[in-house]
């Protein structure tokens, strides 16, 4: 291996290591326990990285698994997200749209959304009050022959609210 190749390889390894270390440092203080926002998250009034931000994503977890279902292989994407509403315009983050593929009449190729849960957490009299989203607030909209949107609005959202939602997309291979 010549010197130029060795330098490039070493540089790439160093960059990858530093990237992994920075990701590790960022996740050390992140609350990964969904359903239980911390007092610190509830009391937060601004984001130090972006003081004018209307909202801040406190945590987003994307998990991907491969499974055998209904006699075939599929990919299961599990998404969990927690957002703090900091300003009135941040309330728009409570309006969520999830796109997915739905081939009319061909269930073997269509994606499915399962396990949708959404919650708003507010402070009242020094206690955290949890408001669950009712399934009646979930709507589906067809965009074209193949594409759909699942839309919902998390209730009781105001400045200071922490919202959480989670769902799974099951996608056949």
Question: Each predicted region: which residue ranges?
Answer:
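N-terminal secretory signal peptides that target proteins for export/translocation
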Residues: 1-6
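Beta-strand-rich, non-transmembrane domain signature
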Residues: 26-173
């Amino acid at each position: 291996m010549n010197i130029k190749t060795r330098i490039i390889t070493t540089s790439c390894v160093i960059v990858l290591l530093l990237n992994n270390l920075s990701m590790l440092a960022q996740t050390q203080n992140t609350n990964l326990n969904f359903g239980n926002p911390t007092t610190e998250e509830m009391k937060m009034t601004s984001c130090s990285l972006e003081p004018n931000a209307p909202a801040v994503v406190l945590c987003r977890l994307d998990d991907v698994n491969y499974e055998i279902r209904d006699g075939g292989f599929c990919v299961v994407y599990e998404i969990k997200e927690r957002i703090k509403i900091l300003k009135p315009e941040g309330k728009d983050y409570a309006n969520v749209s999830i796109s997915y593929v739905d081939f009319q009449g061909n269930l073997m190729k269509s994606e499915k959304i399962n396990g949708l849960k959404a919650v708003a957490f507010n402070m009242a009299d020094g206690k955290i009050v949890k408001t669950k989203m009712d399934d009646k607030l979930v709507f589906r909209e067809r965009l074209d022959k193949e594409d759909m949107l699942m839309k919902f609005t998390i209730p009781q959202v105001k400045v200071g609210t922490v919202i959480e939602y989670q769902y799974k997309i099951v996608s056949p291979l």
